């Protein structure tokens, strides 16, 4: 692996899940967040004891938002962007690193390609493939 870059310390804040108002009371109200827009809404008026609304203070630092723990920008998520990765973004001065997303099925093919030459390709050796065990009948 490539040594870590010098960067601002990466601080991962506690991630809060914001639930929709009264989604715990009714099945017909989904839990995904919606901003309350009613004129009398307690959540919109930020009363004590109500659920929290998303705001800018929950965000992380802009300089370190999408950095990997080694300080590189992750940019590769599919096999299509691999051709650009081999040519332009894998030079030694570029702060980018190829990070293969977890659900990418062509992970092994990407990892064995020439773009892996700079050894800045993360999540390449981990494979969730487990052979199925046959039942003895």
From Swiss-Prot:
Keywords: Ribonucleoprotein, Ribosomal protein. One of its GO terms (molecular function) is structural constituent of ribosome. Residues 95-137 are annotated as: Disordered. It holds the Pfam family Ribosomal_L32e. InterPro entries: Ribosomal_eL32, Ribosomal_eL32_CS, Ribosomal_eL32_sf. One of its GO terms (biological process) is translation. The keyword Ribosomal protein applies. The keyword Ribosomal protein applies. Residues 123-137 have a biased composition (Basic residues). GO terms for cellular component: cytosolic large ribosomal subunit. Belongs to the eukaryotic ribosomal protein eL32 family. This is Large ribosomal subunit protein eL32.
């Amino acid at each position: 692996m490539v040594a870590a870059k010098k960067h601002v310390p990466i601080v991962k804040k506690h991630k809060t899940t914001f639930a929709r108002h009264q989604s715990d009371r009714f099945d017909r109200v989904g839990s995904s967040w919606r901003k309350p827009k009613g004129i009398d809404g307690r959540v919109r008026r930020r009363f004590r004891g109500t659920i929290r609304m998303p705001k800018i203070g929950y965000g992380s630092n802009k300089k370190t938002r999408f950095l990997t723990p080694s300080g590189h920008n992750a940019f590769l998520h599919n096999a299509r962007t691999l051709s650009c990765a081999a040519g332009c973004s894998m030079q030694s001065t570029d702060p980018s690193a190829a990070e293969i997303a977890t659900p990418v099925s062509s992970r092994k093919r990407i990892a064995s390609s020439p773009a892996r030459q700079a050894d800045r390709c993360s999540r390449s050796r981990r494979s969730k493939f487990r052979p199925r065990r046959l039942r003895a009948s």
